Amino acid sequence: MSITHRLGAGQAALPVDRDDPSAGLSARKPPLLAAKSLRAMPLTRRYQSCWLTPEGAVQTSTRLAPATPLFEEAFSALARGSVLMTEDGPVAIEDLQPGQSVLTAEGRAERVCWIGSMVIYPGAETGRDLEEQVSLTRITAEAFGAGRPALDLVLGPRARLCLRDPRLRRVSGLEAAYVPARAFLDGISVIEVTPSAPVTVYHVVLEQHGSLRVAGLEVEAFHPGEGVERMIDPRMLSLFEAQ
C-alpha cells in the first residue's frame, strides 16, 4: 500500500510504499564535480634551485609551488641541451654550475649566481592564463642570419631575445630591447613546439644582469624586476635563495 505525504504549498507529492520506503525515490546519483572545475584547480610544479652561497659553496633545493606566471618566468627560458658560452668554452645548460663565468653579449664575463629549473609535462592542464607555458619555441639554424643560431635552438616558454636594431632608437630611443621569443613565431623558421615527452627547462641569474650567448643568439638572463619581494608571499621567496 502506498501513501502520499502531505507537503507544503508549491511542493510536489512523493508517493511512498510502506513495505518499501525507498520505492519512488530518485535513483540518480549526486552530480560529480565537473571536469571543467577540475581543470580550473591551480597547477603546482616542482621547482629546483641551485645557488652560490656567500662562502662560495653550491646549494640546491626543490620546492613545490603554484605555477604562477612569476614563478614560471624564473624557471623556463632555456630547454635542456642549450649550449652557453663560458670562460671554459661551450657548456650545456644542464651542466652549468653556480660559480662558473659565462660570456655575455655585452662583452663581459659574468659569474652565475643562481640556476632554476622545472619540468614541463605534455598534456598538463594549466588554465587559460598559462596556456603558453607548455609550449616551446624552436628556432631553426640561421633563422636570423649566418650563425644566428648556429644550430637549431629550443627555448622555453619565457625566453626573451635581445633585439638590436637601428629602428629601435627611432621608436624608443633605446639601442636594444628584450622581446619574447614567441613574438617571432612564423611557422617556418621559428616554430611553436608542444613536447611529446617531459622536458626540463632552465633559467640563470648573473652577478650583473646581461644577455647570455646561446648558440649565436642573445638570450636575456633572468631578472625579477624591482620590488618583486612585495609581490609574492614571503614563504615563496625561498625559491630565490641566492637573491
Regions found by a protein language model. Name each.
Residues L84, A92-E94:
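A short acidic-Thr-Gly-centered motif at the start of a beta-strand
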